[in-house]
């Protein structure tokens, strides 16, 4: 039984908390971009920055989904790696965009595809976990009942 007052497993607690913190940071970065950076950046730079914020928000929410799935089905190496890769994707993809917008060398843009691949792998691992017929808990019961 989980040792958390809300009954959350360690994976669920970490993923939901990290996702919420990354969402908070995404809101702050989005507001900063809309108010402080709008006059400083070209329209293309601002669009790129906003893409970084959007991807951060989407994948922070994805990280929270990983935590919820882990709470329902139990943790697995696939879920743990999905969470790690969501975070890595945010750091590499969104982080490189933020840094380039702040004036970092354009060569840093070569890091962004690593973030994109991390995002894709994270979603694939989450799908694999959910579709796995060997899951315990609710998903396993549904598979045994033909659902």
Where on the chain are the PLM-derived regions?
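Glycine-biased, low-complexity coil/linker segments
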Residues: 140-141
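Helix-boundary and loop/linker segments of multi-pass membrane transporters
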Residues: 5-12, 39-42, 74-76
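Interfacial helix-loop-helix junctions of multi-pass membrane proteins
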Residues: 34-49, 95-117
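Hydrophobic alpha-helical segments of small multi-pass membrane proteins
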Residues: 20, 83-97, 112-127
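Interfacial segments of alpha-helical transmembrane regions
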Residues: 7-23, 78-86
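Core segments of alpha-helical transmembrane spans in multipass integral membrane proteins
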Residues: 21, 25-31, 47-72, 86-94
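Membrane-interfacial alpha-helical segments at the cytosolic side of multi-pass membrane proteins
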Residues: 60-73, 121-133
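Juxtamembrane helix-break-helix junctions at the cytosolic face
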Residues: 67-79, 101-105
């Amino acid at each position: 039984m989980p040792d958390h007052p809300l009954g959350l497993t360690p994976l669920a607690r970490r993923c939901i908390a990290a996702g919420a913190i990354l969402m908070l940071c995404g809101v702050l970065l989005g507001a900063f971009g809309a108010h402080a950076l709008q006059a400083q950046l070209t329209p293309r730079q601002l669009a790129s920055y906003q893409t970084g914020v959007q991807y951060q928000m989407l994948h922070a929410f994805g990280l929270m989904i990983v935590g919820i799935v882990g709470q329902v089905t139990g943790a697995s190496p696939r879920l743990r790696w999905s969470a790690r890769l969501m975070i890595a994707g945010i750091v590499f993809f969104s982080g490189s965009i933020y840094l380039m917008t702040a004036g970092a060398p354009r060569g840093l843009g070569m890091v962004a595809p690593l973030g994109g691949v991390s995002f894709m792998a994270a979603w694939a691992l989450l799908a694999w976990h959910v579709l796995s017929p060997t899951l315990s808990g609710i998903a396993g019961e549904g598979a045994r009942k033909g659902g």
